[in-house]
From Swiss-Prot:
One of its GO terms (cellular component) is exodeoxyribonuclease VII complex. GO terms for biological process: DNA catabolic process. Belongs to the XseA family. It comes from Parvibaculum lavamentivorans (strain DS-1 / DSM 13023 / NCIMB 13966). Residues 456-477 are annotated as: Disordered. The gene is xseA. One of its GO terms (molecular function) is nucleic acid binding. Heterooligomer composed of large and small subunits. Keywords: Cytoplasm, Exonuclease, Hydrolase, Nuclease. This is Exodeoxyribonuclease 7 large subunit. NCBIfam families: xseA (TIGR00237). InterPro entries: Exonuc_VII_L (IPR003753), Exonuc_VII_lsu_C (IPR020579), OB-fold_nuc-bd_dom (IPR025824). Its EC number is 3.1.11.6.
Length: 477
């Protein structure tokens, strides 16, 4: 049989909904039925906050999955940073999103599903950073014995900063610079890391002195409260710090990852201040004690040397005994030397007498005569060489003179030209720009002429100075 076009009475009596109507009806039913709920699940699809500041991800278990959203205002209040795969307990309102007909939970509060989950995440992160070498012992730096400037990264309010400042004042007052940060909350980790890097970026000798030592401090709290100091950004900043760093997070039983990256870990903020500086009174007492011991040691050493010197002096022979034998030897040698000199002179005189008769100046005279015969020839050669040299110099001088005359402007003047100079002696290249009444000098080949620029650009000869009375010869100057 063909299908019938008729509908059942029940279908004809059913209310007709639009898509929007049924979607909003379901939304209302879900919200009124469930209201606020607590859901335990594993975070999936987490990519951090959206550009709007809201955070979208999913919650799942081994059988189902649901969408979740944290609005921007609530996300900033979280005490820890959500991560992919973390098991959490979400508290919020169950609702639907009509645009896609999906239900979701709008989270007001998020917490780890037990301390065990956070500890597992912490251990996994510790192993990862340790494998990178951030916790290696060779990276640790020694703390300065007495830092001039100490930088403290902590909350500006509360007991922690007061305890540190009070302890430093008691032990050894130092210049302290406090970089205020939030020590828990979503922005805490970024602020702490920025403070560490900010201190390291300061220049030595700048307006604000660069610290010689850093203290990162926070009071006690739960693992969630201290979680900012387990974030990678903080641990890496501490490991990269060029300034030695002391971590003092929580109480002695609390351990955070920054403790592994720091150069020293203090169980409390007060203990960090004690590590930072010695006790001034103890140093002064130690200096006085060592000074007294040094003086006593010097006195004992001087007395010991004096005793040894006295013993050595008593063992020395008398001066007269030391020089008596050498003096006797000297006298004997002096007598022998005088006699030896006389005998040597007599021997030399006798030898000279024997050879005196054999001495003759004939060989020397013959050599002088032979050398004298060659003098005229040498003189002629010298004369010819000097004559040639003088002739060469004369030719060179004549050539240089002609070349100099060819470059000299006097040759141009001889062809009828003249050189015009101003009062300072500088040549004038054009008449334009010369003012009337200006004095100029015109140089010809044989003489010079002083002139004055007349109005209109002509040159008028300058009047000669009046002659002196008496008719005598005037001054050439």
């Amino acid at each position: 049989m063909p299908p019938s076009d008729t509908q059942s009475p029940a279908a004809n009596n059913a209310h007709e909904f639009s898509v929007s109507e049924i979607s909003f009806a379901l939304k209302k039913t879900v919200e009124e039925t469930f209201g606020h709920v607590r859901v335990r699940g594993e975070i999936t699809g987490y990519r951090g906050p959206h550009s709007s500041g809201h955070c979208y991800f999913g919650l799942k278990d081994d059988k189902a999955r649901m969408d979740a959203v944290i609005w921007k205002g609530n996300f900033g209040k979280l005490r820890f940073k959500p991560e992919e795969g973390m098991e959490v307990i979400a508290t919020g309102k169950l609702t639907t999103y009509p645009g896609s007909s999906k239900y979701q939970i709008v989270i007001d509060h998020l917490e780890p599903a037990g301390v065990g989950a956070l500890m597992a995440l912490l251990e996994e992160r510790r192993k990862k950073l340790a494998a990178e070498g951030l916790f290696a012992a060779e990276r640790k730096r020694a703390l300065p014995f007495l830092p001039e400037v100490i930088g403290v990264v902590t909350s500006p309010t509360g007991a922690v900063i007061r305890d540190i400042l009070h302890r430093l004042q008691d032990r050894f007052p130092r210049h302290v610079i406090v970089w205020p940060v939030r020590v828990q909350g979503e922005t805490s980790a970024a602020e702490v890391a920025a403070a560490i890097r900010g201190f390291n970026a300061m220049e030595k000798g700048g307006k604000t002195p660069r610290p010689d030592l850093l203290i990162i401090a926070r009071g006690g709290g739960s693992i969630e409260d201290l979680w900012s100091f387990n974030e990678e950004i903080v641990v890496r900043a501490a490991a990269e710090s060029a300034i030695p760093l002391i971590s003092a997070i929580g109480h002695e039983t609390d351990t955070t990852l920054i403790d592994f990256a720091s150069d020293r870990r203090a169980p409390t903020p007060t203990a960090a201040a004690e590590m930072a500086v010695p006790v001034r009174a103890e140093l002064l007492a130690d200096v006085r004690d060592k000074g007294s011991r040094l003086i006593r040691c010097e006195a004992r050493a001087i007395e010991s040397y004096r005793t040894q010197l006295g013993g050595l002096a008593r063992g020395l022979p008398k001066l007269q005994d030391l020089v008596a034998l050498p003096r006797q030897r000297f006298d004997t040698a002096a007598d022998r030397l005088g006699r030896a000199l006389i005998r040597a002179a007599e021997v030399k005189r006798a030898r000279l007498s024997r050879v005196e008769g054999r001495l003759s100046d004939r060989p020397i005279r013959l050599r002088i005569a032979n050398e004298r015969k060659g003098l005229p020839q040498l003189l002629q050669r010298l004369t010819r060489a000097e004559t040639r040299r003088v002739a060469d110099l004369a030719r060179s001088l004549d050539g240089s003179t002609k070349l100099l005359e060819s470059y000299s402007y006097h040759g141009v003047l001889k062809r009828g030209y003249a050189v015009v100079r101003d009062e300072t002696g500088k040549p004038i290249r054009a008449g334009a720009g010369q003012t009337a009444g200006a004095r100029i000098e015109i140089e010809f080949a044989e003489d010079r002429l002083d002139a004055v620029v007349a109005p209109g650009g002509t040159v008028a000869p300058r009047k000669a100075p009046p002659k002196k009375p008496g008719g005598g010869q005037g001054s050439l100057l």
